[in-house]
Swiss-Prot record:
Coiled coil: none annotated. It comes from Pyrococcus horikoshii (strain ATCC 700860 / DSM 12428 / JCM 9974 / NBRC 100139 / OT-3). Its main location: membrane. This is Putative transport protein PH1571. GO terms for cellular component: plasma membrane. It is a multi-pass membrane protein. It is found in: Cell membrane. The keyword Endoplasmic reticulum does not apply. It comes from the Archaea. The chain crosses the membrane at residues 10-30, 62-82, 93-113, 140-160, 193-213, 227-247, 255-275, 289-309.
Protein backbone atom coordinates (compact mmCIF):
# COMPACT_ATOMS: atom_id res chain seq x y z
CA UNK A 1 0.00 0.00 0.00
CA UNK A 2 2.85 2.39 0.89
CA UNK A 3 4.58 1.57 -2.40
CA UNK A 4 1.37 2.34 -4.32
CA UNK A 5 1.05 5.68 -2.54
CA UNK A 6 4.66 6.55 -3.36
CA UNK A 7 4.13 5.57 -7.01
CA UNK A 8 0.99 7.72 -7.17
CA UNK A 9 2.86 10.71 -5.74
CA UNK A 10 5.70 10.22 -8.24
CA UNK A 11 3.27 10.07 -11.18
CA UNK A 12 1.41 13.16 -9.96
CA UNK A 13 4.73 15.01 -9.68
CA UNK A 14 5.72 13.91 -13.20
CA UNK A 15 2.37 15.01 -14.65
CA UNK A 16 2.58 18.39 -12.91
CA UNK A 17 6.14 18.84 -14.19
CA UNK A 18 5.04 18.03 -17.74
CA UNK A 19 2.12 20.47 -17.50
CA UNK A 20 4.46 23.17 -16.17
CA UNK A 21 7.00 22.62 -18.97
CA UNK A 22 4.29 22.63 -21.64
CA UNK A 23 2.82 25.84 -20.23
CA UNK A 24 6.22 27.55 -20.14
CA UNK A 25 6.77 26.44 -23.74
CA UNK A 26 3.41 27.61 -25.08
CA UNK A 27 2.38 30.56 -22.89
CA UNK A 28 3.74 33.17 -25.34
CA UNK A 29 2.12 31.31 -28.25
CA UNK A 30 -1.39 30.93 -26.82
CA UNK A 31 -2.71 33.88 -28.85
CA UNK A 32 -1.53 32.65 -32.30
CA UNK A 33 -2.69 29.11 -31.47
CA UNK A 34 -6.19 30.28 -30.49
CA UNK A 35 -6.45 32.65 -33.47
CA UNK A 36 -5.16 29.95 -35.82
CA UNK A 37 -7.85 27.55 -34.62
CA UNK A 38 -10.48 30.30 -34.85
CA UNK A 39 -9.43 31.16 -38.41
CA UNK A 40 -9.63 27.49 -39.43
CA UNK A 41 -13.11 27.29 -37.88
CA UNK A 42 -14.24 30.28 -39.96
CA UNK A 43 -12.62 28.89 -43.11
CA UNK A 44 -14.02 25.36 -42.68
CA UNK A 45 -17.29 25.92 -44.63
CA UNK A 46 -15.31 27.43 -47.53
CA UNK A 47 -12.87 24.52 -47.31
CA UNK A 48 -15.70 21.97 -47.63
CA UNK A 49 -17.04 23.64 -50.79
CA UNK A 50 -13.60 24.14 -52.32
CA UNK A 51 -12.42 20.60 -51.53
CA UNK A 52 -15.23 19.18 -53.69
CA UNK A 53 -13.65 20.89 -56.70
CA UNK A 54 -9.89 20.68 -56.08
CA UNK A 55 -9.48 18.03 -53.37
CA UNK A 56 -9.01 18.28 -49.62
CA UNK A 57 -5.26 18.95 -49.47
CA UNK A 58 -5.27 21.41 -52.38
CA UNK A 59 -8.14 23.28 -50.75
CA UNK A 60 -6.17 23.62 -47.52
CA UNK A 61 -3.09 24.78 -49.45
CA UNK A 62 -5.08 27.41 -51.36
CA UNK A 63 -6.73 28.81 -48.24
CA UNK A 64 -3.42 28.74 -46.34
CA UNK A 65 -1.75 30.57 -49.23
CA UNK A 66 -4.41 33.30 -49.21
CA UNK A 67 -4.07 33.69 -45.45
CA UNK A 68 -0.27 33.82 -45.78
CA UNK A 69 -0.57 36.75 -48.19
CA UNK A 70 -2.81 38.64 -45.76
CA UNK A 71 -0.42 37.81 -42.91
CA UNK A 72 2.51 39.19 -44.92
CA UNK A 73 0.58 42.38 -45.66
CA UNK A 74 -0.26 42.66 -41.95
CA UNK A 75 3.41 42.24 -40.98
CA UNK A 76 4.56 44.88 -43.48
CA UNK A 77 1.82 47.22 -42.28
CA UNK A 78 2.86 46.80 -38.65
CA UNK A 79 6.48 47.45 -39.59
CA UNK A 80 5.78 50.61 -41.59
CA UNK A 81 2.76 52.29 -40.03
CA UNK A 82 2.24 51.10 -36.46
CA UNK A 83 3.57 54.26 -34.73
CA UNK A 84 1.48 56.70 -36.77
CA UNK A 85 -1.51 54.36 -36.58
CA UNK A 86 -1.34 54.34 -32.78
CA UNK A 87 -1.21 58.14 -32.65
CA UNK A 88 -4.25 58.45 -34.90
CA UNK A 89 -6.08 55.70 -33.02
CA UNK A 90 -5.56 57.46 -29.67
CA UNK A 91 -6.96 60.67 -31.14
CA UNK A 92 -9.98 58.84 -32.57
CA UNK A 93 -10.60 56.96 -29.32
CA UNK A 94 -10.35 60.12 -27.24
CA UNK A 95 -12.90 61.88 -29.45
CA UNK A 96 -15.16 58.83 -29.51
CA UNK A 97 -15.23 58.22 -25.75
CA UNK A 98 -15.80 61.94 -25.15
CA UNK A 99 -18.85 61.74 -27.42
CA UNK A 100 -19.95 58.45 -25.85
CA UNK A 101 -20.07 60.00 -22.39
CA UNK A 102 -22.73 62.44 -23.61
CA UNK A 103 -25.18 59.67 -24.61
CA UNK A 104 -28.20 58.83 -22.46
CA UNK A 105 -27.85 55.04 -22.08
CA UNK A 106 -28.82 52.50 -19.37
CA UNK A 107 -26.71 52.48 -16.22
CA UNK A 108 -24.88 49.20 -16.89
CA UNK A 109 -23.86 50.38 -20.38
CA UNK A 110 -22.70 53.71 -18.99
CA UNK A 111 -20.51 51.89 -16.44
CA UNK A 112 -19.16 49.61 -19.17
CA UNK A 113 -18.33 52.57 -21.43
CA UNK A 114 -16.53 54.31 -18.54
CA UNK A 115 -14.49 51.17 -17.87
CA UNK A 116 -13.62 50.87 -21.56
CA UNK A 117 -12.63 54.54 -21.73
CA UNK A 118 -10.02 54.03 -19.01
CA UNK A 119 -8.78 50.52 -19.78
CA UNK A 120 -9.21 49.95 -23.50
CA UNK A 121 -6.66 52.48 -24.87
CA UNK A 122 -3.96 51.35 -22.42
CA UNK A 123 -4.68 47.68 -23.04
CA UNK A 124 -4.51 48.26 -26.78
CA UNK A 125 -1.25 50.17 -26.38
CA UNK A 126 0.40 47.42 -24.32
CA UNK A 127 -0.66 44.68 -26.75
CA UNK A 128 0.47 46.54 -29.87
CA UNK A 129 3.74 47.79 -28.38
CA UNK A 130 4.87 44.30 -27.43
CA UNK A 131 4.83 43.50 -31.15
CA UNK A 132 6.43 46.72 -32.36
CA UNK A 133 9.24 46.34 -29.84
CA UNK A 134 9.89 42.79 -31.04
CA UNK A 135 9.19 42.27 -34.73
CA UNK A 136 10.96 38.87 -34.73
CA UNK A 137 8.49 37.75 -32.05
CA UNK A 138 5.59 38.93 -34.22
CA UNK A 139 7.04 37.05 -37.21
CA UNK A 140 7.34 33.88 -35.10
CA UNK A 141 3.75 34.21 -33.91
CA UNK A 142 2.51 34.66 -37.48
CA UNK A 143 4.36 31.48 -38.49
CA UNK A 144 2.76 29.59 -35.59
CA UNK A 145 -0.63 31.07 -36.51
CA UNK A 146 -0.32 29.85 -40.12
CA UNK A 147 0.97 26.42 -39.05
CA UNK A 148 -1.92 25.94 -36.61
CA UNK A 149 -4.40 27.09 -39.25
CA UNK A 150 -3.03 24.61 -41.80
CA UNK A 151 -2.86 21.65 -39.39
CA UNK A 152 -6.28 22.31 -37.83
CA UNK A 153 -8.04 22.74 -41.17
CA UNK A 154 -6.37 19.67 -42.67
CA UNK A 155 -7.35 17.48 -39.70
CA UNK A 156 -10.65 19.16 -38.80
CA UNK A 157 -12.82 16.05 -39.17
CA UNK A 158 -10.40 13.90 -37.15
CA UNK A 159 -10.14 16.50 -34.37
CA UNK A 160 -13.93 16.85 -34.11
CA UNK A 161 -14.29 13.07 -33.82
CA UNK A 162 -11.56 12.89 -31.16
CA UNK A 163 -13.20 15.60 -29.04
CA UNK A 164 -16.45 13.65 -28.87
CA UNK A 165 -14.61 10.39 -28.13
CA UNK A 166 -12.84 12.02 -25.17
CA UNK A 167 -16.15 12.72 -23.45
CA UNK A 168 -16.71 10.50 -20.38
CA UNK A 169 -19.48 7.91 -20.52
CA UNK A 170 -20.96 9.27 -17.29
CA UNK A 171 -22.69 12.62 -17.84
CA UNK A 172 -21.90 12.38 -21.55
CA UNK A 173 -25.06 14.32 -22.31
CA UNK A 174 -23.73 17.28 -20.30
CA UNK A 175 -20.43 17.14 -22.20
CA UNK A 176 -22.20 17.11 -25.56
CA UNK A 177 -24.41 19.99 -24.48
CA UNK A 178 -21.36 22.04 -23.48
CA UNK A 179 -19.70 21.34 -26.83
CA UNK A 180 -22.86 22.47 -28.64
CA UNK A 181 -22.98 25.61 -26.49
CA UNK A 182 -19.36 26.41 -27.36
CA UNK A 183 -20.15 25.81 -31.04
CA UNK A 184 -23.18 28.11 -30.92
CA UNK A 185 -21.21 30.82 -29.12
CA UNK A 186 -18.22 30.59 -31.45
CA UNK A 187 -20.53 30.61 -34.49
CA UNK A 188 -22.28 33.76 -33.30
CA UNK A 189 -19.09 35.55 -32.24
CA UNK A 190 -16.68 34.56 -35.02
CA UNK A 191 -18.89 33.98 -38.05
CA UNK A 192 -21.28 36.86 -37.43
CA UNK A 193 -20.09 39.53 -35.01
CA UNK A 194 -16.32 39.55 -35.55
CA UNK A 195 -16.42 38.54 -39.22
CA UNK A 196 -18.77 41.37 -40.18
CA UNK A 197 -16.97 43.84 -37.92
CA UNK A 198 -13.58 43.10 -39.50
CA UNK A 199 -14.96 43.24 -43.07
CA UNK A 200 -16.64 46.58 -42.35
CA UNK A 201 -13.42 47.89 -40.79
CA UNK A 202 -11.50 46.95 -43.95
CA UNK A 203 -14.06 48.67 -46.18
CA UNK A 204 -13.98 51.80 -44.03
CA UNK A 205 -10.16 51.93 -44.04
CA UNK A 206 -10.17 51.58 -47.84
CA UNK A 207 -12.80 54.31 -48.12
CA UNK A 208 -10.86 56.72 -45.90
CA UNK A 209 -7.72 56.15 -47.99
CA UNK A 210 -9.29 56.17 -51.48
CA UNK A 211 -11.31 59.32 -50.76
CA UNK A 212 -8.18 60.90 -49.23
CA UNK A 213 -9.88 61.58 -45.91
CA UNK A 214 -6.69 60.45 -44.14
CA UNK A 215 -3.29 58.92 -44.88
CA UNK A 216 -2.53 55.19 -44.65
CA UNK A 217 -1.95 55.20 -40.89
CA UNK A 218 -5.04 57.30 -40.20
CA UNK A 219 -7.16 55.08 -42.45
CA UNK A 220 -5.99 51.93 -40.65
CA UNK A 221 -6.77 53.55 -37.28
CA UNK A 222 -10.25 54.49 -38.53
CA UNK A 223 -10.79 50.88 -39.65
CA UNK A 224 -9.75 49.55 -36.23
CA UNK A 225 -12.13 51.95 -34.48
CA UNK A 226 -14.92 50.90 -36.87
CA UNK A 227 -14.38 47.28 -35.78
CA UNK A 228 -14.65 48.30 -32.12
CA UNK A 229 -17.81 50.34 -32.75
CA UNK A 230 -19.46 47.45 -34.60
CA UNK A 231 -19.08 45.30 -31.48
CA UNK A 232 -20.92 47.82 -29.31
CA UNK A 233 -24.70 47.96 -28.95
CA UNK A 234 -26.54 51.20 -29.81
CA UNK A 235 -23.56 52.64 -31.71
CA UNK A 236 -21.95 51.15 -34.81
CA UNK A 237 -19.63 51.68 -37.77
CA UNK A 238 -22.06 54.16 -39.33
CA UNK A 239 -20.58 56.79 -37.01
CA UNK A 240 -17.24 56.51 -38.83
CA UNK A 241 -18.58 56.85 -42.37
CA UNK A 242 -20.79 59.73 -41.21
CA UNK A 243 -17.73 61.45 -39.71
CA UNK A 244 -15.85 60.86 -42.98
CA UNK A 245 -18.73 62.32 -45.01
CA UNK A 246 -18.79 65.42 -42.78
CA UNK A 247 -15.04 65.89 -43.30
CA UNK A 248 -15.48 65.54 -47.09
CA UNK A 249 -18.38 68.00 -47.03
CA UNK A 250 -15.88 70.78 -46.34
CA UNK A 251 -14.06 69.83 -49.53
CA UNK A 252 -16.81 68.74 -51.94
CA UNK A 253 -20.54 68.08 -51.63
CA UNK A 254 -20.37 65.47 -54.40
CA UNK A 255 -17.54 63.51 -52.74
CA UNK A 256 -19.39 63.61 -49.42
CA UNK A 257 -22.55 62.17 -51.03
CA UNK A 258 -20.59 59.45 -52.87
CA UNK A 259 -18.75 58.46 -49.68
CA UNK A 260 -22.03 58.39 -47.74
CA UNK A 261 -23.51 56.03 -50.36
CA UNK A 262 -20.34 53.92 -50.14
CA UNK A 263 -20.72 53.76 -46.35
CA UNK A 264 -24.42 52.88 -46.53
CA UNK A 265 -23.73 50.01 -48.95
CA UNK A 266 -20.55 48.54 -47.42
CA UNK A 267 -20.76 49.39 -43.70
CA UNK A 268 -24.25 50.22 -42.45
CA UNK A 269 -27.21 49.84 -42.69
CA UNK A 270 -27.54 47.73 -45.87
CA UNK A 271 -25.21 44.87 -44.72
CA UNK A 272 -27.01 44.76 -41.35
CA UNK A 273 -30.44 44.33 -42.90
CA UNK A 274 -29.70 42.18 -45.96
CA UNK A 275 -26.45 40.22 -45.44
CA UNK A 276 -26.10 39.71 -41.70
CA UNK A 277 -29.51 38.00 -41.23
CA UNK A 278 -28.63 35.46 -43.95
CA UNK A 279 -25.43 34.54 -42.11
CA UNK A 280 -27.12 34.39 -38.71
CA UNK A 281 -30.44 32.71 -39.54
CA UNK A 282 -29.06 29.14 -39.33
CA UNK A 283 -27.20 29.78 -36.08
CA UNK A 284 -28.30 29.93 -32.49
CA UNK A 285 -28.66 33.47 -31.24
CA UNK A 286 -26.39 34.76 -28.49
CA UNK A 287 -27.54 37.65 -26.32
CA UNK A 288 -25.88 40.89 -27.40
CA UNK A 289 -25.19 41.72 -23.74
CA UNK A 290 -23.53 38.32 -23.19
CA UNK A 291 -21.44 38.77 -26.33
CA UNK A 292 -20.52 42.33 -25.39
CA UNK A 293 -19.47 41.47 -21.84
CA UNK A 294 -17.65 38.36 -23.06
CA UNK A 295 -15.71 40.15 -25.80
CA UNK A 296 -14.63 43.23 -23.86
CA UNK A 297 -14.34 41.49 -20.50
CA UNK A 298 -12.15 38.88 -22.16
CA UNK A 299 -10.12 41.63 -23.83
CA UNK A 300 -9.50 43.40 -20.51
CA UNK A 301 -8.65 40.15 -18.69
CA UNK A 302 -6.63 38.21 -21.29
CA UNK A 303 -5.71 40.64 -24.04
CA UNK A 304 -6.53 40.06 -27.72
CA UNK A 305 -7.09 36.32 -27.25
CA UNK A 306 -9.82 37.17 -24.71
CA UNK A 307 -12.04 38.31 -27.60
CA UNK A 308 -12.58 34.60 -28.27
CA UNK A 309 -12.00 33.09 -24.81
CA UNK A 310 -14.30 35.53 -22.98
CA UNK A 311 -17.55 34.68 -24.83
CA UNK A 312 -16.68 30.95 -24.77
CA UNK A 313 -16.19 31.06 -20.98
CA UNK A 314 -19.55 32.78 -20.49
CA UNK A 315 -21.16 30.33 -22.92
CA UNK A 316 -19.84 27.38 -20.90
CA UNK A 317 -21.11 28.94 -17.68
CA UNK A 318 -24.58 29.33 -19.21
CA UNK A 319 -24.46 25.71 -20.40
CA UNK A 320 -23.65 24.54 -16.86
CA UNK A 321 -26.50 26.64 -15.45
CA UNK A 322 -28.93 25.19 -18.00
CA UNK A 323 -27.76 21.65 -17.18
CA UNK A 324 -28.14 22.30 -13.45
CA UNK A 325 -31.69 23.55 -14.03
CA UNK A 326 -32.55 20.46 -16.06
CA UNK A 327 -31.16 18.17 -13.35
CA UNK A 328 -33.16 20.09 -10.75
CA UNK A 329 -36.40 19.68 -12.71
CA UNK A 330 -35.82 15.98 -13.35
CA UNK A 331 -35.14 15.13 -9.68
CA UNK A 332 -38.26 15.24 -7.46
CA UNK A 333 -38.07 17.27 -4.28
CA UNK A 334 -37.56 15.64 -0.88
CA UNK A 335 -41.10 16.53 0.18
CA UNK A 336 -42.51 14.93 -2.94
CA UNK A 337 -40.47 11.77 -2.39
CA UNK A 338 -41.60 11.53 1.25
CA UNK A 339 -45.24 11.81 0.18
CA UNK A 340 -44.74 9.05 -2.38
CA UNK A 341 -43.21 6.88 0.34
Amino acid sequence: MVELEKEKIVWIAIILLIIFLVWETLKDLIAPIVFGMAASYIAYPFHIKLSKKVGKRNSVLILSGILSIFSLIFFVGVTLWITDTLKNLYNYLDAFFSWLSTLNVPGFLSSLFDALATSFPEKLRSILLQYTLSLPKLALQLIVFLAVFYATLLNADFLAKEIYELLPLTNRELGEKMIEKVKDTVDAILKTWLFFSVVKGIFLALGFYLFKISNVAGSIAAGVLCIVLELLPVVGGWIMWLAGAIILLRRSMLLAIIFAIYGIITISPIPDYFLKPKFAKERAKVSSVVALVGIFGGWIAFGAVGIILGPIAIGLLLALIDAWREIGTKQPSKAHRSQDA
